[in-house]
């Protein structure tokens, strides 16, 4: 047998739940074509994996790599840990969808997190256009959510207040466009800028669109209102809209049993709700200050 790449002598864990095995892996093109005892095979490249685990690439379902995937062709801090796919657009904040004005605002807001400069902006507006900009830029794969703060800022700006009917139509159109362009779901960060002004009814209406596509609602809940109260809201959004719910970095590991009981008690019918826990103290806060010179002087 002939391969482009032969990985020999490793311990294969295939991700299916099957027991680990000692095996070789043969690859041709971008496909694994054989797993087993392949010592008789030849290949252009041979990797000695003795003492190592050979596994499918890991998917990082919560990160803020949005800008780094655009700026760097290779991020060793992720690939050396085995991450081959990044799911971006989390916590309701990213670099798309935008218009010319909100693009500037989001680049400024996310500067410390993702490091993009205005000079890095290539004119994208829709989520699909931004993902197209990522194509071929980085060795990793990428999937994205529709980030709700970006969507809401397009319709309502960055101020307080609830949405009116016209703004809601705009929001739903942009979310629908994002889902049609391949987004896996909608993300929110309800402690953060813009989306903190969205009430439960607003989020249910938007998630109705996401549910049409079988998408996911990934939420950094409204933790500042109290973990259990925030949990009740997340479950209600899933129940009323029919959307699948993913709770980002659940803050309350010591109350996990209470949280599970809370979810079960709240469900008159089953919904797909899954928490992902935050095992340590939160380490990120955000302060949004208008970057007009007079505001900066007042702050200093």
Describe these PLM feature segments.
Residues 130-134, 138-165, 171-192, 207, ...:
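Active-site neighborhoods of metal-dependent hydrolases
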Residues 1-57:
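Histidine-rich, glycine-flanked metal-binding segment
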Residues 10, 30, 51, 62, ...:
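Divalent metal-coordination and catalytic microenvironments
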Residues 177-233:
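Divalent metal-binding pocket/active-site signature
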Residues 71-184:
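Divalent-metal coordination cores built from histidine and acidic residues
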Residues 66-68, 93-97, 152, 191-195, ...:
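Active-site environment of divalent metal-dependent phosphoester hydrolases
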Residues 53-77:
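Di-metal (Zn2+ and/or Mg2+/Mn2+) metal-binding site signature of metallo-dependent hydrolases
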């Amino acid at each position: 047998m002939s391969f482009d790449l032969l990985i020999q002598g490793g311990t294969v864990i295939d991700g299916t739940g099957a027991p680990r095995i000692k095996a070789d892996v043969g690859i041709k093109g971008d496909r694994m074509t054989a797993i087993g005892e392949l010592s008789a095979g030849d290949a252009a490249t041979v990797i000695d994996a003795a003492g190592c685990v050979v596994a499918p690439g890991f998917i990082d379902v919560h990160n803020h790599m949005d800008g780094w995937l655009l700026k760097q062709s290779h991020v060793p801090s992720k690939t050396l840990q085995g991450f081959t796919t990044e799911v971006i657009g989390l916590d309701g904040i990213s670099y798309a969808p935008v218009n010319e004005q909100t693009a500037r605002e989001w680049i400024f807001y996310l500067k410390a997190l993702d490091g993009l400069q205005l000079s890095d902006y290539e004119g994208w507006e829709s989520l699909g256009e931004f993902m197209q900009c990522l194509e071929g830029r980085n060795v990793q794969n990428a999937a994205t959510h529709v980030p709700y703060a970006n969507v809401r800022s397009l319709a309502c700006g960055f101020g307080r207040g609830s949405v009116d009917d016209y703004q809601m139509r705009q929001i739903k159109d942009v979310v629908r466009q994002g889902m049609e362009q391949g987004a896996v779901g909608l993300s929110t960060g309800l402690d953060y800028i813009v989306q903190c002004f969205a009430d439960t009814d607003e989020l249910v209406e938007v998630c109705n669109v996401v549910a049409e596509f079988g998408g996911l609602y990934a939420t950094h809940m409204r933790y500042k209102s109290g973990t259990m109260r925030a949990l009740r809201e997340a479950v209600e959004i899933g129940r009323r809209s029919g959307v699948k719910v993913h709770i980002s970095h659940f803050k309350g590991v010591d109350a996990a049993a209470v949280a599970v009981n809370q979810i079960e008690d709240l469900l008159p019918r089953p919904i797909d709700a899954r928490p992902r826990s935050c095992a340590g103290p939160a380490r990120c806060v955000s302060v949004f200050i208008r970057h007009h010179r007079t505001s900066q002087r007042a702050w200093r």
